[in-house]
Amino acid sequence: MKDISVKALAKINLGLDVVRKREDGYHEVRMVMQTIHLFDRLEISKNTSGEITMETNLSFLPTNENNLVYKAAKLLQDEFAIKDGVHVWLHKYIPVAAGMAGGSTDAAAVLYGMNQIFDLGLTREELMERGVKIGADVPYCIMRGTALAEGIGEKLSKLPPMVKCPVLIAKPQISVSTKFVYENLKLGSDMVHPDIDRLVADIREKDLYKIAADMGNVLETVTIPAYPVIADIKDHMMEHGAVNAMM
């Protein structure tokens, strides 16, 4: 096989809670994640150049080692002493800096695609083990579907498929830094946390309205005061028939 076309699915959070800040500075989370049918497409091909190259339809995206696509290709090229070069054409449709794992899912697609092209024989679990070296969300983007993530996001438990429903996504013209959000998160006794266990139970029951009622993202306590447009969008969605709206 010389080339392959791979879909890289976006993800949304149905629930996100931060349990505590660990001594190493990382935050321990519990979140329920779901892949959706919005995706980037990656055309991956091998050549004799020995180099990793990429191009994309978005001029502002890096196409060097600063892109997770490049890092994923480099990881497998180095580990398996692959002499051939790899070229990736990234057709980017997932909004950038939207919390939808756009970079991570592209990296996951490269791991999957190179595994096929070079006949590496890696299982999904083995791909996930390599994915975590690139980013905490990459293993989930390989797993896909509905899942509970714990730890710093790397401990994954598969959940029953989410009940099918339409999803509307709005991306305002803002870019929220993950570092900014976590640095300004105040984990106090007065904070209202989403009930992740109840949300998981709702998913098992396949009750859309219970799921909607129990959705929540504790990071909104930081983002909404800083970017009121998020609240405006949520209100607009609720006024026009959404069963719930969440960042």
PLM regions with names:
Residues G85, A107, L111-L148:
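Contiguous, small/hydrophobic- and glycine-enriched helical/loop subdomains that border
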Residues W89-F118, A136, V243-M247:
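Glycine/serine-rich anion-binding loops at beta->alpha junctions
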Residues L16, M100-S104, A136, T146, ...:
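Gly/Ser/Thr-rich helix-start
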Residues G15, R30-M33, Y70, L111, ...:
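Conserved protein kinase catalytic domain
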Residues A72-E79, E126, R130-K133, D214, ...:
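Generic non-transmembrane alpha-helical segments
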